[in-house]
Amino acid sequence: NFVAIFRDHLLEQVLEIIKGIPVPYDPAGEKRVNVSANAGVYVIPEGTVFENVGDIINRIMIVSALARKEEEGSVIFYDDRMMEVRDRSMRIQRIFPMALAAKEFKVFYQPKVDVTTGRIVGAEALCRWYRDGKIVPPMDFIPVLEQNLDICQLDFYMLDCVCKDICRWLAEGKEVVRVSVNLSRKHLPDADLLEHIMTIIDDNQTPHQYIEIELTETTTDVAFKDLKRVVYGLQAEGISTSVDDFGIGYSSLNLIREIPWN
């Protein structure tokens, strides 16, 4: 990582270099390779006074992290909304363990209906966060929790809630349908994922036929192998599987050819 500070009239020239410039690598200067960088740019407003250089660095770090996620040679400019987003993300990560312990996350069931008969034939478990009397939209907290392994804790919590609901409905003599529970791809590197899933289901004494695990497409060859292992393991236990967001991940045709989704 490099940080540079310069007068704004040089900005266009600097950005041209950052986006890519041929650099010779032999003594004669005839062999060249194109070298580029991703960069975050903070244009310091005229007349701004900072107490310390860290205030500037914080802004650069936010925007450079965003630039690194883009394609090669990307340049992103800072604006104050980015600081607000970062502060909100940090707050969510800080209060998440307490919110989970307080059971602020609730399960909503979205029905799957057979359009020919009108019968409910299944459901998908959706997570909603109740905080201070209001619902926090999923897009405000799911992407934040996916930045680390917090999302895995939430997924397991949701699976446990679904298992408890299913067992309660069965005990009440209600007609129960299969419920799908979404698991983030963040789980896939976990070598004991299958064991963790089955422990939650079996500790609740939930009949396997009422659970479906919904997994998101992978983006790498290694993760694809992990996904394949988990799906085969779940099906050996009588747990149905489905694929979420099909068509946006890695090797979509292999995904449906090599893995026996339900």
Functional labels for PLM-detected ranges:
Residues 1-90, 94:
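Cyclic-dinucleotide signaling modules
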Residues 3-7, 42, 126-128, 182, ...:
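Short hydrophobic/aromatic beta-strand micro-patches
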Residues 17, 21, 56-63, 125, ...:
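Structural preference for long, well-ordered alpha-helical segments in enzyme cores
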Residues 27-30, 70, 102, 114, ...:
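Nucleotide second-messenger and two-component phosphorelay signaling modules
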Residues 47, 117-124, 149-226:
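Catalytic core of bacterial c-di-GMP phosphodiesterases, primarily the EAL and HD-GYP domains
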Residues 62-106, 116, 145-151, 185-194:
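C-di-GMP signaling machinery
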Residues 88-145, 182, 243:
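Active-site core of bacterial EAL-family cyclic-dinucleotide phosphodiesterase domains
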Residues 198-262:
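The catalytic core of metal-dependent phosphodiesterases that act on cyclic dinucleotides
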